[in-house]
């Protein structure tokens, strides 16, 4: 996972911890917790099943030189990622997916708006963070076990 994505997910995890303490009865139905659940489903199941699926294509929205970028759409959120299906490592062919960025509630999808996730992400790409090179994305990525973080919340704040 790219640090840009990790930062957004960590913020959501912190909010989930607060909700677990302050609103335990509403925890499962809280919009932030539902958003976190959707992200978990996307990165652990839906996207890895077939990252090349046409539903993840974004066309020329970011410009023709950024067509390799994929995105998952859910509500007014966009999760941007890149994948490569033929990376060789130790004579084994690997499929690598790098989850790069997710907009927050300050930049919900609204076509034409300067804070629209596509507009924000395009500016980020032009500024070089995240990098356009897949190799650089992989180098910048960090190991982040989201499931471990969720288990920590459950242990810290049992029902």
Model-derived segments and spans:
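Basic, Lys/Arg-enriched alpha-helical interface segments
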Residues: 1-76, 84-159
